[in-house]
Amino acid sequence: MGQKVHPNGIRLGITKPWISTWYADKSDYANNLHSDWEVRKFLEKKLEAASVSKIVIERPAKSIRVTIHTARPGVVIGKKGEDVEVLRAEVAKISGTPAQINIAEIRKPELDAKLVADSIAQQLERRVMFRRAMKRAVQNAMRIGAQGIKVEVSGRLGGAEIARTEWYREGRVPLHTLRADIDYATSESHTTYGVIGIKVWVFKGEVLDGMLPQVEEPKQQQPKRKPRGK
């Protein structure tokens, strides 16, 4: 049977950036890697309701910088930035180094595979019909500007005794094209009948000039300086 390679893994360094960007000596590498895992685990649990897509970790000069990509920055920041300060203190405690937390807003959550998968998972837990949840996610993504999307759910769908897999696709999702900007993510829905797995592929277009920018925030243009003496 044909198997699919992980769409993000095969594109690392081609069109996809890494989610941990640091260099370490042999003696520190394992500790840093485990620290990254613990920080991500803590933040994902703490920010479960904040629509977090991904967490990027950098380690400049014996410190840790965490960038949280979220569709609901207000939930992460909290009232007057109190929640961010609590998160910063916790991350510093886990990593054992001074921490800095940045928030990057996701402008179009309908095109983010992780947020789409989590949304479908939440709907299935609320007993929404799986076909309706899949179709709604696909229609929203295509309406916002996706060139293609595929959604796959597997498990005891609708409470059936025998588990099965169903999928729905619209547009094109070229998995073999390395320059294709394909966002892929998975999620789990814990229903009364058991766990249902969700996979989402979103094709946003082709990347023709190398790597994608990591942060989705638009750059502010600097005002032009007037020449002296005028």
UniProtKB/Swiss-Prot annotation:
HAMAP family: Ribosomal_uS3_B (MF_01309_B)
Domain KH type-2: 39-107
GO cellular component: cytosolic small ribosomal subunit
Protein's job: Binds the lower part of the 30S subunit head. Binds mRNA in the 70S ribosome, positioning it for translation.
Name listed for the protein in its UniProt record: Small ribosomal subunit protein uS3
Ribonucleoprotein as UniProt keyword: yes
An example molecular function term from Gene Ontology annotations: rRNA binding
